Amino acid sequence: MEKQVEIPEVELNSGHKMPIVGYGTCVPEPMPPLEELTAIFLDAIKVGYRHFDTASSYGTEEALGKAIAEAINSGLVKSREEFFISCKLWIEDADHDLILPALNQSLQILGVDYLDLYMIHMPVRVRKGAPMFNYSKEDFLPFDIQGTWKAMEECSKQGLAKSIGVSNYSVEKLTKLLETSTIPPAVNQVEMNVAWQQRKLLPFCKEKNIHITSWSPLLSYGVAWGSNAVMENPVLQQIAASKGKTVAQVALRWIYEQGASLITRTSNKDRMFENVQIFDWELSKEELDQIHEIPQRRGTLGEEFMHPEGPIKSPEELWDGDL
């Protein structure tokens, strides 16, 4: 058996532990065949990844489920309990009565009895069956922050999700959610990287004991919707060269040192190893100060979730001015 890396864990406010580095299963188009995707996820398991992040909108739940089943059946992993599986509710199911059925469907496709973490993907709602990312004014519906969270709490109470959380929530939206919640979100999965350091959201979530996970530690470098603002940043390039590390490792280590966890995605097995070689060294105060000086700009505005006559009309409304 190949030598596996060991990834530290963080304890969430739910009492459950989550590996600091997760493997992301959102893959760029064109989607690889099921067998190829399953093999990639199995490679990640062989490397030592146990935290896998998926979503109903990714179209990768089946391949992930097959990889997990194969890993268990082959003896590579002892049991389902060794995995931390997170999944996200898509916006067409972001309504009180649709959430439990959506979770059950994800469980069925994944072939598991429970999720370790279930999150609301976006604080947005569209009509059921609306064409993904090609929404018209009629597709957008009002999103009930407190009502959707009540249904998420029910998922937790039924034991179908050990922890529940949100994704892409601002300070203002979290504040509204917390006004009526009985179970606080364990995680807020957001865009966070050296080019968007979440200087408003991060301290708020720390104060409320809500853990931040970055879904964009490298800003999706190399794919159509991505950006070079992290991987081609001269500050990171200089730090990486001086430490004998890669730019990616410096970017990932910075997130870890902020007390956040991160989701990485690569089909390259060498880079799977590289992305978790971040725990036995640290950044100096001078290096952290240099990173703090990097100009800040949110990379993803989410304009596909806005309409001039819809519930959300602008980036300012979606992110409550935190741009």
From Swiss-Prot:
- Residue positions annotated to bind NADP(+) are 53, 167-168, 189, 215-220, 289-297
**Enzyme Commission designation:** 1.1.1.439
- The active site consists of Y58 (proton donor)
Q: Where is this site: Lowers pKa of active site Tyr?
A: K88
- Signal peptide (from-to): none
The annotated pathway is: Alkaloid biosynthesis
The biological process GO terms on file are: alkaloid metabolic process
Query: Which family, according to the similarity comment?
Result: Belongs to the aldo/keto reductase family.
Assembly and interaction partners: Monomer.
Q: What is this protein called?
A: Protein REDOX 2
Name the gene behind this protein: Redox2
